[in-house]
């Protein structure tokens, strides 16, 4: 068989799914979340190209452990792409596309609006640019219109003097890095 079916327990939490040969360490780390980190419920899917090589789920959907986590249990996930974005930005730096201390406006002149001409790429990435929000209420259509969204982001005013203060740019960091 090209996959190993999984039906296991970790600290009383059922774990189900499959792992392809060579991906067994993913199962072990998945189980560790229950054994060592008091995970209640979780899922993990890994694809290599178009081929699924790991599909695991286990535990419970609720803290009182009455509803099992199923293969199709929905979960709200935040910040899952920030690591990928950071890797992409680091690769762009290593390939010489820009330097972290470059001003954003040196690559995106429209960004200089509203006294933002000195904000650096580093400040966008380290959450000190003063741009944690977009003041304009955005529609789904605007979020999907990258060119139009770029114009809105360029107009945005900072919420504080960039540099000395930090404030999590959780929703906006990806938008600015996209530019």
Give each language-model segment a name:
Residues 71, 76-80, 92-136, 154-155:
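Active-site helix/loop module of the DD-peptidase/beta-lactamase fold
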Residues 22-26, 77-81, 85, 117, ...:
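Hydrophobic (often cysteine-bearing) scaffold residues that line and stabilize catalytic clefts
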Residues 19-22, 100, 117, 142-145:
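Residue-level signature of the cytosolic catalytic core of signaling kinases
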Residues 90-97, 175-179:
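Short glycine/serine- and small hydrophobic-enriched flexible loop segments
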Residues 16-77, 99, 155-156:
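Short, conserved catalytic-motif segment at the N-terminal edge
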Residues 134-179:
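Catalytic-site signature segments of enzymes, centered on catalytic residues
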Residues 1-23:
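Short, compositionally biased leader-like segments
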């Amino acid at each position: 068989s090209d996959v190993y079916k999984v039906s296991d327990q970790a600290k009383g939490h059922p774990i189900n799914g499959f792992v392809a040969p060579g991906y067994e360490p993913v199962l072990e780390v998945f189980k560790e979340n229950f054994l060592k980190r008091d995970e209640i419920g979780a899922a993990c899917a890994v694809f290599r190209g178009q081929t699924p090589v790991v599909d695991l789920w286990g535990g419970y959907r609720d803290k009182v452990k009455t509803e099992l986590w199923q293969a199709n249990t929905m979960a709200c996930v935040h910040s899952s792409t920030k690591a990928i974005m950071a890797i992409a930005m680091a690769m762009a730096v290593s390939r010489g596309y820009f330097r972290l201390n470059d001003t954003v406006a040196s690559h995106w002149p429209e960004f200089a609006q509203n006294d933002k001409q000195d904000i650096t790429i580093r400040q966008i990435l380290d959450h000190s640019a003063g741009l944690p929000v977009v003041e304009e209420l955005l529609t789904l259509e605007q979020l999907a219109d990258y060119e139009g969204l770029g114009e809105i982001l360029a107009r945005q005013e900072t919420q504080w003097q960039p540099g000395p203060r930090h404030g999590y740019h959780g929703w906006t960091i990806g938008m600015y890095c996209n530019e």
